[in-house]
Amino acid sequence: MNPELQSAIGQGAALKHAETVDKSAPQIENVTVKKVDRSSFLEEVAKPHELKHAETVDKSGPAIPEDVHVKKVDRGAFLSEIEKAAKQ
């Protein structure tokens, strides 16, 4: 390695001072956060409630028309056919 380069690396670089802007403080002045008593709320949630029946439309099934038939593929025969073609 070049001796000039080694000495430049050894001396290091002169860095300029960086000014930082701390924005971690709250943006709204004169605001206090109050402690909320959640015990009454939690008691209300724990009580049994009467719920209304909800009508749902289940569209999670496959959207294949009834006149379309999907047949099962014999995977073993299919793979052996590919294997035979690869050996040729």
Curated annotation (Swiss-Prot):
Instruction: Please give the superkingdom of this protein's source.
Output: Eukaryota
Q: Looking at the keywords, is Nucleus present?
A: no
Q: What keywords tag this UniProt record? A: Acetylation, Actin-binding, Methylation
Region listing for Disordered, in residue ranges: 1-22
List every position bearing N6,N6,N6-trimethyllysine: K35, K72
Q: Which residues form the WH2 domain?
A: 37-54
- Any idea what this protein is called? Actobindin
